[in-house]
């Protein structure tokens, strides 16, 4: 019978170390793809900013070690733009604002909460410096919208709350939201610090709005011919 001669055996075409590297790279590529897809779900495709869940988490974590200012930012009249010029115009306005906020990444964190609402945390506690930053943001957005006839109704409103590391994210969020509400009820297209508004003023602002809505409803129904608010 013929004897097996190892020297005559064809060389192994499979190199185990190379195969291990190939498998390792394949798995690495798969994991990178999955992570990329997960990251994509956390970012708004229009503005490129983190969406609510990621943005709020990053902001809350950052606030634990940094004093600063939480800003609740709202784009005014987005619905009006969508209704008159279509959603492409509204999306264009959102993209413009997103780009402006991305350019300020060195100043803090920004995210899109949804719709026309955005959240920012600026690592600055000086009201004068913060006011200059907000003025600059408002002016740059105004310059963009005035150059585009379809975006001429778009303006910004913002509520600001000065925060320290001792403050909770939830408390500052609520205060910034109240400051934004005050702005919305007093003409829009401006910003206010929560610390500038006392509780009685905030309460009066809300009550006044409610009374005005009731009066308008009564006038339309014909129950009252004239009501002065």
Predicted regions and their residues:
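Conserved long alpha-helical elements within nucleotide-processing catalytic cores of c-di-GMP signaling
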Residues: 39-42, 51-69, 76-103, 111-115, ...
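Active-site core of bacterial EAL-family cyclic-dinucleotide phosphodiesterase domains
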Residues: 206-228
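PAS-family sensory domain
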Residues: 68, 108, 156, 189, ...
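Amphipathic alpha-helical regulatory segments at dimerization interfaces
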Residues: 61, 100, 140-143, 182, ...
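Cyclic nucleotide signaling catalytic output domains
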Residues: 110, 157-165, 171-186, 192-206, ...
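Signal-transducing coiled-coil linker helices
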Residues: 5-45, 52-67
């Amino acid at each position: 019978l013929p004897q097996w001669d190892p020297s005559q055996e064809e060389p192994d075409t499979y190199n185990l170390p190379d195969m291990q590297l190939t498998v390792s790279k394949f798995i690495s590529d798969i994991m990178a793809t999955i992570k990329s897809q997960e990251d994509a779900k956390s970012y708004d495709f229009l503005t490129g900013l983190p969406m609510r869940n990621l943005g709020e988490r990053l902001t809350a974590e950052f606030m634990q070690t940094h004093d600063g200012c939480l800003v609740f930012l709202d784009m005014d009249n987005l619905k009006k733009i969508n209704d008159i010029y279509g959603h492409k115009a509204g999306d264009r306005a959102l993209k413009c604002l997103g780009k402006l906020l991305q350019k300020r990444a060195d100043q803090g964190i920004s995210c899109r909460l949804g719709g026309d609402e955005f959240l920012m945390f600026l690592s600055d506690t000086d009201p004068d410096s913060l006011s200059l930053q907000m003025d600059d943001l408002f002016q740059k957005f105004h310059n963009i919208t005035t150059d585009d006839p379809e975006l001429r109704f778009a303006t910004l409103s913002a509520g600001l709350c000065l925060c320290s590391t001792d403050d909770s994210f939830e408390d500052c969020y609520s205060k910034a939201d109240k400051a934004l509400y005050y702005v919305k009820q007093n003409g829009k297209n401006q910003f206010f610090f929560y610390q500038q508004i006392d509780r009685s003023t905030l309460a009066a602002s809300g009550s006044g709005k409610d009374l005005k809505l009731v009066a308008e409803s009564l006038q339309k129904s014909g129950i009252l011919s004239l009501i002065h608010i």
